[in-house]
């Protein structure tokens, strides 16, 4: 009986330590994520269009649970919440080197192809031509391989899955740079608002 009681107490003690360690690990990850997000910059559309919180380049999914395999979209900027979210966070130093790098997910923005209407995906950074973009003097993000193609948000928006009021989403493509649609092709770079 003493042996069974000892085993039971040992099991309970280990379970409590495991829960405590798990909780500490979760808190540590949250703290690291918060610190990292303070170093991120968001890329936002200069025109708010129909979203007063603005549109930012965003990984499809939700913050830490975003999946880079799902590609990029324009989504309500999260900076109104006080910080740049990891799924909208870019390394501004790498942007100066024509690389749109998202450090939390260790991926770079990449064009599906180098023609109009190309979609954007995320891949491991390897400096291939489809990953080289320039933030030009006209506030456009253009593909180095075809500077006539601008990063463009779609004309129509749809509701996302969260937020109050509900967040909005628009598709992102590379389209011919044009003054007719410049309100959907001009971008800025900032830390949290």
Where are these regions (language model features)?
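Extracellular glycan-recognition/adhesion modules and their associated mucin-like linkers
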Residues: 21-68, 83-115, 130-160, 181-193
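Surface-exposed turn/loop modules enriched in turn-prone residues
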Residues: 67-83, 118-127
